[in-house]
Regions:
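Charged, amphipathic alpha-helical regulatory modules used
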Residues: 18-118, 683-684
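Short, hydrophobic beta-strand segments
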Residues: 21-23, 64-71, 238, 483-488, ...
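Conserved catalytic cores of very large enzyme subunits
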Residues: 112, 116-470, 491-494, 498-642, ...
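Contiguous, well-ordered alpha-helical segments that form the cores/surfaces of helical PPI scaffolds
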Residues: 234, 474-487, 506, 660
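Core of folded catalytic or high-affinity ligand/protein-binding domains
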Residues: 466-470, 474-477, 668, 676
Length: 685
């Protein structure tokens, strides 16, 4: 409902509250006027048809809240704040909004201005604009389908459902492909209904790469998050027989560029993709017969292809180090190196790449208390703690649904209502539980009743689908642990209060573990990326409580909350202490974590990074982490500089600065304002 749709700027009503300290109301198109409470009541009556007495009651409650914010320093009010508060108050009275969508001219203009800012992987294209316009309509429609309880919690800022527009027609978050499925079956673009051109199982290395790229591209329309390939180098190794280094290099280079230049993702984005590169053969593959050319099972096992797998790893690393035709990073696929049981000093090229472009991620399954795990996108994890078989737990499935709880909002709500923090948190956990299950039911309806995703559920000769929904994770995410602890009176997350952080983590994990056990569903707890949600949810609290009392970071115009249970980026804690603390907390969220270590402008030595990586693996609980250092690139002469350099010293033109936004490296010019605030406050080591 657009409650302000009926409020005209030129209307003035006798009897409005006369205030000496006026509040300015700013509309979405930038126009301003003085706050007049009576307009709220009149608009409510006109749109909902309720009696004037109830409308006045709601109007007074809203006005009281707004002037309380005025006392706390509020000078300017956004129409979105009024809209959200009206919706919340109507829900409390049992009045639901009409299930239609109002689109204003200013909505369209706002999208034209900012449609590339919600996702740092988005660029300005016609496809992106088309997608953003559709997304706005779909998102507004989907809000009419939420339960009153969910809508109220969402409007308040307690919970956040990601990719809301895509709930209508996608639903799934992430997918990790088992390449053996298409290596044995070939490529059927529409699944098993025999529509479209069918490719037989690949017989050559370059064809195997092509079928992997095509499969991920075809899966992308069904996925809101990332697509990935597990055990990439070992799965491709059996196809390399009698090939020269140059031939393999050229095929892999073509694959890497194709993954970036095929804009098949939502809104003409590059595929948000990842590949796992194993430094040593995973234990579960050592005795498995390899699938080779033509989809034939070989007499050799994957352990017999160590040399070829290492060559693939080295070539991909070297291609990434050289960059694209202008010297920029090749952003996708994300490169995830499984480092367990490896001598990291033998992989100097990987750490050279990390020092130059910050692209590699490092994964240690043993630190997540499992034998193996695949990682999707920038943190979602599939450890083999479901059935115990990595072939089932770690590939051919993914993350189906995830939702975020804003811990600062929970703490503020508990204080506002004079309630116990854990009581409010438990309410939100069960609210998320029910919402996730409803969303999963809708995915099943889309897939099996409406046949939206026949490509994803096509079956092999044994009747096993390419994506096994029953093995996918259902996860609860969270935001703002550090600010939550501040609100509760413990100060920002640190060594002194990490026991309180772990207490909250264990409370949430206890619930997901119980659901997993009782429902036989793969529930888990993980660190939400919150690329845009960190700013959006902080903004809701700033609007409700004022900047100071929201405990948000950044500024009042560009606030953000710290991601998950990370130590605040501006905390002066030394790097070793940060590693110890965040490493100790990662195993409490086995469904996905990341530790970001922001390095200074000096060029890190590969040997030093390898040594630090080894220590993190061997002496902490961190199972997924990355080293990040900013670098700037001149768009004219293509010179690269370490650090955030605003102007090229040679050409004197503005440079592009690259860094890791939440999990992946991208141009900071595409970041939203909340993440820009975080970027400015990051402490580098």
């Amino acid at each position: 409902m657009n409650i302000l749709f009926y409020i005209k700027k030129e209307l003035f009503f006798k009897g409005d509250y006369i205030m000496t300290d006026k509040i300015i109301v700013t509309h979405s198109d930038g126009k301003q006027e003085i706050f007049r409470p009576r307009l709220i009541g009149q608009a409510i009556v006109k749109e909902t048809g309720i009696d004037e007495e109830l409308a006045l009651k709601i109007q007074k409650r809203i006005t009281k809240k707004i002037y309380k914010l005025k006392e706390e320093g509020l000078e300017e009010l956004q129409t979105t704040q009024i809209r959200a508060e009206v919706s919340s108050q109507l829900l409390k009275e049992g009045i639901s909004e009409e299930p239609y969508v109002i689109i204003k001219e200013s909505d369209i203009m706002n999208i034209l201005e900012d449609y590339d800012k919600n996702n740092a992987n988005q660029v300005r294209t016609a496809g992106a604009l088309e997608y953003s316009l559709f997304e706005m309509i779909a998102k507004r429609y989907m809000t009419t389908q939420y339960s009153n309880e969910w809508r109220e919690a969402r409007e308040y800022g307690l919970v956040y459902n990601h990719d809301a527009a895509q709930e209508l027609y996608k639903g799934l978050n992430c997918f990790t492909l088992d390449p053996r499925f298409v290596f044995k079956k070939g490529l059927r673009t529409y699944g098993d209904n025999h529509v479209g051109v069918v490719s037989k199982p690949p017989k050559h290395f370059d064809t195997a790469l092509e079928i992997c790229e095509q499969t991920l591209g075809l899966a992308t329309p069904y996925i809101a998050g990332g697509v990935s390939i597990a055990c990439f180098n070992y799965m491709l190794a059996p196809y390399m027989e009698n090939l020269s280094y140059e031939s393999v290099y050229q095929s892999l280079q073509g694959f890497m560029f194709q993954m970036n230049q095929s804009h098949k993702n939502r809104g003409s984005q590059s595929m948000f993709s990842s590949i796992t590169l194993d430094m040593v053969c995973p234990e579960f593959l050592k005795n498995q017969k390899a699938i080779g050319p033509g989809g034939v099972e070989l007499t050799k096992t994957y352990a017999d292809f160590d040399k070829e797998a290492r060559l693939i790893l080295d070539i991909i690393t070297n291609i990434s180090f050289n960059g694209d035709g202008e010297g920029k990073p090749i952003f996708f696929p994300n490169l995830i190196y499984n480092i367990d049981n490896a001598n990291l000093r033998d992989f100097e090229n990987v750490f050279d790449l990390s020092a130059k472009f910050s692209l590699p991620y490092f994964c240690s399954a043993k630190n997540n208390n499992v034998d193996y795990q695949s990682t999707l996108g920038c943190r979602s994890a599939l450890p083999n703690n479901w059935t115990g078989d990595p072939n089932i737990d770690c590939m051919g499935t993914g993350n189906s649904v995830y939702t975020t709880i804003s811990l600062p909002a929970v703490a503020l709500k508990a204080k506002e209502d004079n309630r116990n923090f854990y009581d409010v948190l438990e309410e939100m956990l069960y609210l998320v539980h029910d919402y996730n299950l409803n969303r999963l039911d809708w995915i099943k309806k889309l897939w099996y009743d409406y046949h939206v995703a026949d490509f994803m559920i096509q079956e092999d000769d044994n009747g096993v689908p390419m994506y096994r929904l029953e093995d996918a994770t259902i996860v609860v995410g969270y935001l703002g642990m550090s600010e939550c602890l501040e609100i509760l009176g413990y100060g920002p997350l640190s060594r002194e209060n990490n026991d309180k952080c772990q207490e909250i983590m264990k409370f949430m994990k206890k619930h997901t573990d119980e659901w997993k056990q009782n429902e036989n569903l793969r529930w888990g707890l993980f660190q939400t990326p919150c690329e845009s949600a960190a700013g959006k949810l902080a903004t809701k609290m700033v609007n409700r409580f004022g900047f100071k009392n929201s405990y948000a970071k950044g500024t009042s115009n560009a606030p953000y909350y710290t991601n998950s249970n990370h130590i605040a980026v501006d905390n002066s804690i030394d790097i070793i202490e940060r590693i110890k603390l965040e490493g100790a907390n990662q195993p409490l969220g086995p469904a996905g974590n990341i530790m970001n270590l922001y390095l200074g402008e000096s060029y890190a030595q590969a040997s030093a990074l390898a040594s630090l990586c080894e220590k993190i693996r061997d002496y902490t609980g961190a199972y997924f982490f990355a080293f990040t250092s900013e670098f700037s690139l001149c768009p004219q002469c293509f010179s690269t500089f370490k650090g955030n350099i605003s102007e090229c010293p040679f050409c004197h033109v503005e440079t592009d600065t690259f860094s890791r936004i939440t999990g992946y490296v991208t141009n900071t010019k595409t970041w939203n304002k909340g993440k820009i605030s975080e970027f400015k406050e990051r402490k580098r080591y």
